[in-house]
């Protein structure tokens, strides 16, 4: 029987980040246990055309705010990921219920700015996944 000192339950952002931090500190006696067949947890991006993988559509979280999420902003930068400001000018369309028609409303700007990752938030998961030893990750 194989024994391990550290078990990380879940391969979402928190689980992969925990494994990444262990790797950064030279700690290798760990496993990551994920019930699903894929990593990422609530973060998932759909890439409709593989030829344009940089244009993923986020199905979970879409934005981050490095202006107050300092650790996440630093992680994105340290992983060499490209980010861009969320488009905020013009009107927006809001659908409050499937029983009511969508309504056009004046847009607004976030302070601090909302940022997105090139390729969707899945790019963050993919970058962390590449830095975690494959043999330590066990998916369902």
Functional labels for PLM-detected ranges:
Residues 1-140:
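FAD-dinucleotide binding site
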């Amino acid at each position: 029987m194989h024994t391990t000192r550290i078990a990380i339950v879940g391969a979402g952002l928190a689980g992969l980040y925990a494994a990444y931090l262990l790797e950064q500190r030279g700690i290798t006696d760990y496993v990551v246990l994920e019930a699903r067949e894929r990593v990422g947890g609530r973060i998932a991006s759909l890439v409709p055309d593989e030829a344009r993988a940089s244009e993923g559509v986020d199905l979970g979280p879409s934005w981050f705010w490095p202006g107050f999420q300092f650790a996440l902003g630093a992680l994105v930068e340290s992983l060499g990921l490209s980010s861009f400001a969320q488009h905020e000018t013009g009107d927006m369309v809001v659908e409050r219920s499937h029983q009511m028609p969508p309504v056009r409303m004046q847009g607004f700007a976030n302070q601090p700015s909302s940022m997105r990752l090139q390729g969707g938030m899945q790019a963050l998961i993919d970058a962390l996944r590449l830095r975690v030893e494959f043999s330590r990750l066990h998916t369902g």
